[in-house]
């Protein structure tokens, strides 16, 4: 399973590096860009609910399934894109049930988020007055980790009983 998980993260890691300058330019029109991505996520989730077979679990995941879900994770590098929405939808379109698709989507986010955070941390370390910001950065990091964990836990529980239509 670790190999499949690793393979699923490769597309987003490559896209993050190659598209960095293009994506930074998109933040000049954030409302338009975010609107386009939110509508795309809504369409993907609707298609996943309508066409997804939802009969498979993570134990049946192949490298090809992981690649498909990983390719959808590329959308997350663009402003306003829902990483979880696009990857959960891709998992469901590959035939996975909602909870399995969501679990995989969140597991595959860990390596990508760690890589992106490490990359951004290199810029933070170069700050002249870093010492004065460290307490705020630490509070922000801990708060984000706790809220993220609680949100994922809630969403996994929600998706065992409900569809993606409400999103």
Q: What residues fall within each predicted segment?
A:
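Multi-pass membrane proteins that catalyze or facilitate reactions on polyprenyl-/lipid-phosphate substrates
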Residues: 1-166
């Amino acid at each position: 399973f670790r190999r499949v998980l690793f393979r699923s993260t490769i597309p987003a890691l490559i896209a993050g590096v190659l598209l960095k300058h293009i994506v930074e330019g998109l933040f000049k029109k954030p409302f338009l860009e975010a609107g386009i991505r939110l509508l795309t996520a809504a369409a993907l989730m609707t298609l996943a609910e309508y066409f997804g077979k939802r009969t498979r679990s993570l134990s049946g995941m192949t490298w090809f399934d992981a690649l498909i879900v990983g390719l959808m994770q590329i959308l997350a590098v663009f402003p306003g894109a829902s990483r979880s929405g696009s990857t959960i939808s891709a998992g469901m379109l590959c035939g996975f049930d909602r909870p399995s698709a969501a679990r995989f989507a969140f597991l595959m986010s860990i390596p990508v988020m760690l890589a992106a955070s490490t990359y951004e941390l290199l810029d933070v370390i170069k700050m002249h007055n870093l010492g004065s910001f460290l307490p705020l950065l630490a509070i922000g990091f801990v708060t984000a980790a706790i809220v993220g964990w609680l949100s994922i836990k809630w969403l996994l529980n929600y998706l065992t009983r409900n569809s993606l239509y409400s999103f």
